Amino acid sequence: MRYLFLLNPAAGKQDCTVQLIPQIRAAAARAGWSAADYTIHTTEYAGHARELARAAAQEAAQAGDSLRIWTAGGDGTFMEAMTGVQGFANAAVGCLPYGSGNDFLRTYGTRAEFTDLDAQLAGGEVTIDLLETSLGLSATICAAGLDAQVAYGIPKFRRIPLCGGEMSYLLSIVEQLCGRIGRRVTFTIDDEELTVDCLMCAICNGRAYGGGFLAAPEADPADGWLDVMIVRRVGRLTIAKLLGMYKSGLHFVNGQLTEEAKPYFLYRRARRVALRPADGRGPIVATADGECAPCDAVEAVLRPLSGRILLPAPAYERFVAKRSSVDAK
């Protein structure tokens, strides 16, 4: 078994490498690893984690070894490594959450579990579904609409002096709320086609995105289905109430939309989803696991059980127990 840590110093509010490198070495020693058992790399540019992960997986495969990779950064760094190891059955990827969103872990456990290096090294490998999207591979959620527009606008405000992460986020929200809200969008959900006046939508393999919005609070990332949540366009006075419900996951309980949510939400289960603007206003902004861009059309296709991930020990035990329960039904 080979072990690799990929640390992204540009993720989050501060460089995680200074504190993490000695902590990794100490945890490795407690696990009985020698210095030759693992490697620590610091990424230097966008896409570097993908390159390093792929090279390591290929080298391990040629030697007949298995490989475990942990990324330290955000969801984008994690998905870079996941993309890099695609096609290598010998490799699995885990996440140390030191980015700004860290939504991947919310489907499986808590931040405390995922930052516990001893639990990470003692954890196990599981197989999950992945999403192939217009923005690349995703383990969690592909979304479009108001929330994606807010995310897309943040970098512009970060360039303003003394405008940090939270202020940039608030300014981007204000900008979007001052503009025209919502889009008319045509969805193709498996064999169903519908056109909706849409505030935003989420195609979900995992449960959360956008820094903790529980779009699909009961999503199972290994059940072979996507949970599709479409939020209808509403007036500005209703948005705050709607977003509060959406963030807390109170719109969806026991496998269905709540009565309070039904006027505002549409829910479907599918394996393939496509959407395109139907209002003649140009591209729609979409986001998926750290990537964000305007798109003329967005497509998300389920890739069943195509991702091999690492979970810290408590999360791994819960995942295995749940899968055993589901399989027994």
Predicted features and spans:
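ATP/NTP phosphate-donor binding region
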Residues: 1-69, 316, 323-329
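Short Gly/Thr/Asp-enriched flexible loops that form oxyanion-binding sites at enzyme active sites
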Residues: 77-90
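Gly/Ser/Thr-rich active-site loops/lids in small-molecule metabolic enzymes
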Residues: 158-168, 211-212, 217-240
